[in-house]
Amino acid sequence: MRRPLRRVTVVLLWVALAIGVAWFYDYRRSMQSLWKIRQHGKIVVLTENNANSYYIYKETPMGFEYDLAKAFAGHLGVDLEVKTPGWDALFASLQRGDGDFIAASMTHTRKREQYADFSEPYLSVRQHLILHKSDHSIVTPAGLAGRTVHVREDTTYQQRLEALQADGIDLQLVLHRNTPTEELIEQVAKRQIDITVADSAIALLNRRYYPDIRIAFPIEKEQPLAWAVRKGDRGLRTEINRFFDEIKENGTFTRIYNRYYTAVDTFDYVDVKKFHQRIYTRLPRFRPLIEKAADRHGFDWQMIAAVIYQESHFDPFAQSHTGVKGLMQLTRVTAEEMGVTDRFDFEQNITAGVAYLAKLRHRFDDIEDPRTRLLFALASYNIGYGHVRDAQQIAKNMGMDPNRWQSLKEVLPLLRNREYYADTTYGYARGNEAVRYIERILTYYDILKQKKAV
């Protein structure tokens, strides 16, 4: 009796050992890519080359997905390499090992799970119809009957529109193999096609470039965006999830998101439409002086142009009831300080205004990040250096980092409330206007960056 029992025990031990060995090798294989990434000191991201994910401007890489991927590489302590094989080749490139993960504002769907494993969602979006601003003929999905909709092939847009067709809506669907959604949006703006579909993030970002479009109602419930890794790559997937948890907790995700999308939320069609026109009708007259002054003080000339448009709409004779005058809306005190004899002389105005902005930026040399230092200087240009320092103190009192733009953005509006400004040095200020001021400048700046003819 004991011998059969012993035999069963031995068999069970061998089975357990086999399972353990199989688990060990499976676990080792699932962790191998992360180990190799750290060994080689580099991670390769597969993404899209567009305004939403990744693009190069003056030799500087930018884009929402790029910034997230760059932060992830920093989280791992490795360098980042970017590859853009094209939307249709993303999964194939991942499976071949051309890249380690996909970061391309990709929605996580069941169909795509057969090609890759996905991280936890980091953002949710909704699909919207995109029409010309003059087209108000469609108010419900049923209004698509008899209309033609253009979308990129093999996207969730195609899947949703086919579902509407299956529900009985007689729409005509035109699929584009190699045409990015951004180009279809441009075609709507130029009246080359009537309708396309884009998710909310892509739609918002592109509306600033194509103010003639209208973002209509959503045609789908919220969908999750996630990063993709090779099937079975649990190690990298787990690390990505840990990374997103970390950056959402410490505010990094919010800062990156706000850089690309917050200013879009304050979109004003009439104002942006005028800006697009005045880039060609007014800006050329002042551009040489703007470039000269910007170069002297180490600014991007397009940022200075954006500031000037926010201040005066490129009108050299602009003046306010507060007494500020000229292209950069100089106060009398600032003009005297900077040696300006005529604030309506646009050469004097630009030269002095840019020099003064550089002076303000220098006063924030304790802030290491150049972009943050610029934003603090712009806030000071708008409401005054003293108020910005007051806001920093409030942020510090609230346990926030006073040298972060996200902190300043949250506390500046508090300068309107007595319970906060009563104990400050400079008192009351309309800090919310300073926040909106900077958001508009960033919108104008981004438009100028994307303008190929400027």
UniProtKB/Swiss-Prot annotation:
Biological process (GO), any one: peptidoglycan metabolic process
Keyword Lyase listed: yes
Entry protein name: Membrane-bound lytic murein transglycosylase F
Region LT domain, annotated ranges: 266-454
Record keywords, A-Z: Cell outer membrane, Cell wall biogenesis/degradation, Lyase, Membrane, Signal
Domain-level remarks: The N-terminal domain does not have lytic activity and probably modulates enzymatic activity. The C-terminal domain is the catalytic active domain.
Enzyme Commission number(s) of this protein: 4.2.2.n1
Superkingdom as given in the UniProt entry: Bacteria
Residue segments, region Non-LT domain: 25-265
Family to which this protein belongs: In the N-terminal section; belongs to the bacterial solute-binding protein 3 family.
Transmembrane stretches, start-end: none
GO MF annotation list: peptidoglycan lytic transglycosylase activity
GO cellular component, one term: cell outer membrane
Cell location: Cell outer membrane
Species of the source: Desulfosudis oleivorans (strain DSM 6200 / JCM 39069 / Hxd3) (Desulfococcus oleovorans)
Main location: membrane
PROSITE patterns xref list: TRANSGLYCOSYLASE
